[in-house]
Amino acid sequence: YTTLFRSERKNPGYVANRQFPGQGAWKDIKAKLSGMSPLEQVKAVNVLINRWPYRTDMDVWGVMDYWETPVEFFQKSGDCEDFAIAKYFALRDLGFPASQMRIVVLKDTLRNLDHAVTAVYLDGDAWILDNLSNAVLSHKRLSHYRPQFSVNEEYRWAHLTPSAPKKTGR
């Protein structure tokens, strides 16, 4: 992921003339979004990026796991972490600070699969942008998601599950 962040700085995916199917140029989309509240911007970005088709890394790159830059995502589409990355950088381009966002790799306990989402911290809550849904939900409503680690441009975090203390004998 560090290579991804460096690459995005050198060749940004969100350039003024980037075309979004059925939506026009990024500069025009960005102008429309600028009049919205931060949460409305988050919701609009989630819906916009979710229009791309889901494609596995094996189908696109011939490898099990590859984190795409937004430029690569817009050219080929991708899987869950690629959607999360594209959303993260769209929000960065809209002015959201890195400190308010994370790309979260998690375990979906309902489907028993690894998954990735974008988390945005607003108004004391973490809002989850997911390629599986156009609805942006509070993390509190997604108890089947167990975060494993998360990253942004500045930091990385390991998420640990607390365990009950073990009783010991005398």
Can you say where each PLM-predicted feature lies in the sequence?
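Hydrophobic/aromatic-rich core segments of domains that either
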Residues: 89-144
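His-Asp-centered catalytic microenvironments across diverse enzyme cores
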Residues: 125-170
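Short, small-residue-biased leader/transition segments that mark boundaries at the very start
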Residues: 1-4
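Secondary-structure boundary elements
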Residues: 19-73
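Active-site nucleophilic cysteine motif
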Residues: 76-87, 91
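Short leucine-rich amphipathic alpha-helices used at interfaces
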Residues: 65-66, 71-72, 77-79, 122, ...
